[in-house]
Amino acid sequence: MMNPPVKIGVNVFVIRDNKVLFGKRIGKVGHGTWCLPGGHFEYGESLMDAAKRELREETGIISDNLEFVHIINDPEEHTHYVHINFLAKDFQGEAEVTEPDKFAEWRWFEIDQLPEDIFSGHKKFIPTFLRKLTFVDKQ
């Protein structure tokens, strides 16, 4: 039996006023759970361009200033994902549901009060990363 292919995706931590943006998923995979904006690459796309595109497509938010955060290698029994994660602190626009077939809503959560039902593919790295962040943002 052949192993399934390794999937590579990008995710964006969108941070404002010590809050992080999560989308409530709908559909087959992860229905009812909360996740970061993100997705898969299009052919020929750079890491940064994929992250910017996914952020814009899913939320309507535009950011030209993403910071690389980390890469997570996440092999599981039936799937193997590599997550390439970015941070957006500088952005324009307000989060809106631009893909109603994928998301029910976008909501800001306090960094120390994350939702209980985080998407399984993100559970391993979201809380750990956010605990390490320190913000001084008094704009």
Summary of predicted features, one role per range:
Residues 72-95, 107, 122, 128-133:
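Active-site-adjacent beta-strand/loop module that shapes the phosphate/pyrophosphate-binding cleft
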Residues 4-6, 64, 80-82:
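Residue-level preference for beta-strand/loop junctions
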Residues 15-20, 29, 42-43, 88-94:
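Short, charged/polar surface micro-motifs in flexible loops or helix N-caps
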Residues 29, 33, 100-139:
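Nudix hydrolase/Nudix homology domain
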